[in-house]
UniProtKB/Swiss-Prot annotation:
SUPFAM superfamilies, alphabetized: Histone-fold
Crosslinked positions (Glycyl lysine isopeptide (Lys-Gly) (interchain with G-Cter in ubiquitin)): K131
Assigned protein family: Belongs to the histone H2B family.
Any one cellular-component term (Gene Ontology): nucleus
Positions of region (Disordered): 1-46
Protein name according to UniProt: Histone H2B
Modifications made to the protein after synthesis: Monoubiquitinated by the UBC2-BRE1 complex to form H2BK123ub1. H2BK123ub1 gives a specific tag for epigenetic transcriptional activation and is also prerequisite for H3K4me and H3K79me formation. H2BK123ub1 also modulates the formation of double-strand breaks during meiosis and is a prerequisite for DNA-damage checkpoint activation. Phosphorylated to form H2BS10ph during progression through meiotic prophase. May be correlated with chromosome condensation.
PTM sites of type N6-acetyllysine: K8, K9, K13, K24
Cross-referenced Gene3D superfamilies: Histone, subunit A
Cross-link annotation Glycyl lysine isopeptide (Lys-Gly) (interchain with G-Cter in SUMO), location: K8, K9, K24, K25
Source organism of the structure: Gibberella zeae (strain ATCC MYA-4620 / CBS 123657 / FGSC 9075 / NRRL 31084 / PH-1) (Wheat head blight fungus)
UniProt keyword annotations, A-Z: Acetylation, Chromosome, DNA-binding, Isopeptide bond, Nucleosome core, Nucleus, Phosphoprotein, Ubl conjugation
Length: 137
């Protein structure tokens, strides 16, 4: 009778451990899979699509835009901003300043964009800065 009781105890422990082990493995797999999903959702791409869409609707309310066209415009905006920032950084370095001000941005826009486009960009930028300054006071 004693051997039967001893057999029962290890037998009852072994299946419990065995049943827990696969659950842990499955749980580990689930966490890894859900962890991957969480990582994917956390890595957001910042785009200008919503702003481009708003401007499009202001200019042409009945016109749509494809995803490919939106991607191209987003790349264009990123490229222009990168060029302006780079040029403004160079201008600040030439003048031995550590801060990029609106003056450096304005000058870099004049250097990068041609003719009338630069004039319009500068006037719109000045208008936006004025509007922002008046709203913060």
């Amino acid at each position: 009778m004693a051997p039967k009781a001893a057999d029962k105890k290890p037998a009852s422990k072994a299946p419990a451990t065995a049943s827990k082990a696969p659950e842990k493995k499955d749980a580990g797999k689930k966490t890894a899979a859900s962890g991957d999903k969480k990582k994917r959702s956390k890595s957001r791409k910042e785009t200008y699509s919503s702003y481009i869409y708003k401007v499009l609707k202001q200019v042409h309310p009945d016109t749509g835009i494809s995803n490919r066209a939106m991607s191209i415009l987003n790349s264009f905006v990123n490229d222009i901003f990168e060029r302006v920032a780079s040029e403004a950084s160079k201008l600040a370095a030439y003048n031995k300043k550590s801060t990029i001000s609106s003056r450096e941005i304005q000058t870099s826009v004049r250097l990068i964009l041609p003719g009338e486009l630069a004039k319009h960009a500068v006037s719109e930028g000045t208008k936006a800065v004025t509007k922002y300054s008046s709203s913060t006071k």
